[in-house]
Amino acid sequence: DPGHTSYFDHHRGRRQRCKIRMRNYVDAHLCFAEIKLKGKRGQTEKRRIACPVDQYGVLGERAQSQIRSAYRDLYARDLTQALEPICWMRYRRTTLVAKEGGERMTIDRGMVFMDASGTCRIDDDLVIVETKSGNANGIADKILRRLHQHPTNSASKYCVSLAALRQVSKYNKLLPALRKLAVVPTHATPTA
């Protein structure tokens, strides 16, 4: 939404927050609208709604209705914000999956963040690695720690993109991630 409610809820660490996005899987010719909700005990719940590929970027009436319903089901209140696109991003993703245990790791590179005012390109040599294991102590987590690649807490690509595109001026919690990606905004001094 234009007020960046999702960003500020994330930045403030609100327990009940959501993020809405559309995903276009180019190679698979698939498109989804997704809502990610923080549920009980901090667990993330994700709901996906299949959308026509040729309507990528347009959150249709059916998808909006299902998103609002998912929000209402979990939080027992209505999602009142306008659902409008405020940024776009492109990247190439590699996903590695363990043969046993369900551990996954995603590696995103070639990131480009865009909005109506401009574009921010991340150096192609820089990547975002995300590990997905039950207790953050999987094989990939251990290897990354041995290589002194420690996680940056609560740094979603969505939040990083808004700070990098200068849509928000409060981004102190994101500074470690922004520095690693060499995209610290220079327009103003960050505030808490």
Describe the role of every protein-language-model region.
Residues D1-A192:
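Phosphate-end processing signature that detects enzymes handling 5′-triphosphorylated RNA
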